[in-house]
Amino acid sequence: MQTLAQHLTSKAVNESLSQLILTLADTSKAISHAVRHGALAGVLGATEQENVQGETQKKLDIITNDMLKDALKVDGTVRGLASEEEDHVVEVSANGKYLVCFDPLDGSSNIDINSLVGTIFSVLPAPAGELTETSFLQSGRNQLAAGYVLYGPSTMLALTTGQGVQLFTLHPETNEFLLTNAAMSISPDTQEFAINMSNQRFWEAPMQTYIADLLLGKIGPREKSFNMRWIAAMVGDVHRVLSRGGIFTYPTDNKDPKKPYKLRLMYEANPMALLVEQAGGKASTGYETILDIQPTQIHQRVAVILGSANEVDACLSYHGIDYSEEPTLD
C-alpha cells in the first residue's frame, strides 16, 4: 500500500502543496490521539466561550484549533488561515503560497457521546499583496486541495488535489496514512437520504414536498423506498455518501429568520462540494452550484444539497431547476 507521501509524489503534486497536506495529515494524527483519550485526558465537555457564530465551544474545539494553528505556523507554506473557531483571519507567514480554511472538529457536539467527529480543510492559493479577509474570498473552484479526516473506529483521510478522491486509513501500529481506496466514486442513484427531520416544519415548500415524496416510498411519485440516515456531523454523513452513495442536505429554513442557513461555505460546504464533484456527485444550495458561489465573508453560511448526481437533480427539480444537463457557456 502507498503511504500518503508516496501517493502525492506519484500524482506529481508540487512539493510545497505536498508539504502542506502532510502537515495537515500529521496534525490530524495528533488530533485523533486527543479525541481517543477523551474523558481520560479531561478534554470532554463545553467551555464558557462562544465562537464567532455564537455557538458554545467544546474544550476539544479549542484544543484542536490550536493544534492546527501551531502546526501551520511552522509549516512555512501558509500565508494565512481561517477557522470556524477564529473571529478573524490569521496571518501566518509572509512568504507562504497558500491559504487554509478549516473546521478543526466538525460534529463536536458528538464528542461527549463518543460518536463520529472529524476535521475538514480547504487549501486556496494566496494572492499577492497584504493579507486581508478579502484574500480568502475565492470561489470553491479555486481550491487546490480539500479533504477531511474522520475520527471513527478507524481514522481516515479523504483527499482531493483535483485528481479524483483518494481514501487513506491511519495504520494503528506504523502511524502512517495508507492508501485504501484509490478512486472513491459516488453512485448516481440512491435510496438513502440524510437530513435533520426535526426542522421539517421550518423548511421551504420545495424541500417539504421532496422529503414527503421520499417518505411515501413505493406508493409515492418516486416509486421506490428510501431509508433515512443522520449522524449529526457533516463529516460522517458525507463520508457515507462518498462510500456508498446517498444525498445529504441541510436546507434553508426559517427556524431563526436571521440565520436561514446552518453550514459554513468556506470550510464546510466548499471542501465537501469539491470532494463530491471529484467523486462524480453534485453539490448545490438548491438554487446554485456551491463551487460557483462568490463568497462575501469568511463565516458565510449556505444551504447544502449534495451527493448522488441523479438524486441531487431530482431534489433540484422540486426547486424548479433542471441540472440534468451541464450548463454551457456562451
Curated annotation (Swiss-Prot):
Record carries keyword Cell cycle: no
Keyword flag Zinc: no
Subcellular location per the Swiss-Prot or TrEMBL entry: Cytoplasm
Keywords for the protein's UniProt record, in alphabetical order: Carbohydrate metabolism, Cytoplasm, Hydrolase, Magnesium, Metal-binding
A Pfam family the protein falls into: FBPase
Source domain of life: Bacteria
UniProt pathway: Carbohydrate biosynthesis; gluconeogenesis
Binding-site list for Mg(2+) 2: 103, 106, 268
Cofactor note: Binds 2 magnesium ions per subunit.
Gene Ontology terms describing biological process: fructose 1,6-bisphosphate metabolic process; fructose 6-phosphate metabolic process; fructose metabolic process; gluconeogenesis; sucrose biosynthetic process
An example Gene Ontology CC term for this record: cytosol
Residues at which substrate binds: 106-109, 196, 262
Family note: Belongs to the FBPase class 1 family.
Protein's UniProt name: Fructose-1,6-bisphosphatase class 1
